[in-house]
Amino acid sequence: MDVDLQLFKNIMAESRHNSDLLDSFSPNQFLSKEKIIKLIRDQLILRTDSEIVIFGGWYGSILIPAFKQITAIDIDPKVISKAKYKIFKDYNVDFISKDVFDWAPDSSRIKNTDLIINTSCEHMPSMKKLELDTNAYFAFTSNNMYDIEGHINCVS
């Protein structure tokens, strides 16, 4: 994977004011996202113009530079603002601050997207409760860290 030095500088500059940001780019976060990127690319399910929607986008991740057309949704407006205006300001990403369960069911973007990624399933109710009208592929992950505050949907 090529390293975007400007993105790295943006992350480092913003992390001076926000230590939580570093957690979103921690080695475990990085490796899990890298694995998803590899699995998606190995499946040959995307075209160069594929639209990808990321649920629970947080501050963004290495998923954003890995793909061309991204919509990142997160319920936290402060996180979305930092991702949009500070970290990924030079990327073609549509950042949306909404609850996935409110936004996605009626979104025309969901109907037309090729891939929906959620690497934050542990923070949300079961995705089975989210009824979507789409032919998209899904890449969902959770973890087994039951003891962390805010983790409501872990798996073993």
Predicted features along the sequence, with ranges:
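Conserved SAM-binding motif I beta-strand of class I
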Residues: Q69-D74
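Conserved acidic residues
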Residues: S50, K68, K111-D114
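Conserved class I S-adenosyl-L-methionine
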Residues: R47-Y59
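S-adenosyl-L-methionine
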Residues: M1-T48, I75-L115, T119
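C-terminal substrate-binding/active-site "lid" region of AdoMet-derived donor-dependent transferases
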Residues: P125-S156
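Conserved SAM-binding loop of SAM-dependent methyltransferases across substrates and taxa
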Residues: W58-K68
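A short acidic, amphipathic alpha-helical/loop segment
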Residues: P65-A66, D106-R109, S126-L132
